[in-house]
Amino acid sequence: MAPPAPGPTSGGSGEVDELFDVKNAFYIGSYQQCINEAQRVKLSSPETDVERDVFLYRAYLAQRKFGVVLDEIKPSSAPELQAVRMFADYLAHESRRDSIVAELDREMSRSVDVTNTTFLLMAASIYLHDQNPDAALRALHQGDSLECTAMTVQILLKLDRLDLARKELKRMQDLDEDATLTQLATAWVSLATGGEKLQDAYYIFQEMADKCSPTLLLLNGQAACHMAQGRWEAAEGLLQEALDKDSGYPETLVNLIVLSQHLGKPPEVTNRYLSQLKDAHRSHPFIKEYQAKENDFDRLVLQYAPSA
């Protein structure tokens, strides 16, 4: 079984983290709960106010409410909030993305304030969306926070560098083994490892869902564990639950496309999920790869078509 969920004194210092519930909700993908907690919590210092607002606006970004972030974060706002606004600007304005990345490149080439963890995370997020994982990793390696390391683990797993991901996970475990982010990273690495580790990953996702909330992130994590073990029907139930919560969540739709193929569902079922994904997330990497393969297939068909 997974270790017990961490409490608000996690981090080794014994001090109470006033933002524990806000952060925890964000990390497990419970974005509305994060917003609610952020608006309700009473804080003891201006620095904590800024940190609270960072998570509040990042939760709005996760809900694709870019306008809220762009309207409310002003030029006079703290540098951490300016970084969140930069990412909101990137996500909201496709036509401006190249210029935003170019400006970010210039900032990264100068002396960066490595204590501004939010800037490093937002820079890495932009580079990742821009299909530049190397630049994302360079940004993250300048920070030493648990969240920077957790994001590094995610990127390394996407690059099939399980060996390096394990090393980063070890760093997280040495820093704070019981932290929510460390537990999630442990589940991601276990899922990528496969075999008997799949059950360990499943227990972590399940325990978090039971103790906190069965979020889209956790439901998809559980479903991925089932799919990796060939338990397609069990995965389908979890993915349907996720679909009921949000019919446009990209990971749910990608997993349902894969699952439909394995269960031999009619082609129209797979195509329906594919259309939903295209409508909601036309620049999603899965869609780009799918369209590239479609184009390759069309070229092959023309190549071997009988001449008139």
Swiss-Prot record:
Main location: cytoplasm
Its membrane topology: Peripheral membrane protein
InterPro entries per the UniProt record, alphabetical: Coatomer_esu, TPR-like_helical_dom_sf
Compartments where located: Cytoplasm; Golgi apparatus membrane; Cytoplasmic vesicle, COPI-coated vesicle membrane
Location of Phosphoserine modifications: 13, 45, 99
Post-translational modification: Phosphorylated by PKA.
Function: The coatomer is a cytosolic protein complex that binds to dilysine motifs and reversibly associates with Golgi non-clathrin-coated vesicles, which further mediate biosynthetic protein transport from the ER, via the Golgi up to the trans Golgi network. The coatomer complex is required for budding from Golgi membranes, and is essential for the retrograde Golgi-to-ER transport of dilysine-tagged proteins.
Protein name as annotated: Coatomer subunit epsilon
Gene source species: Pongo abelii
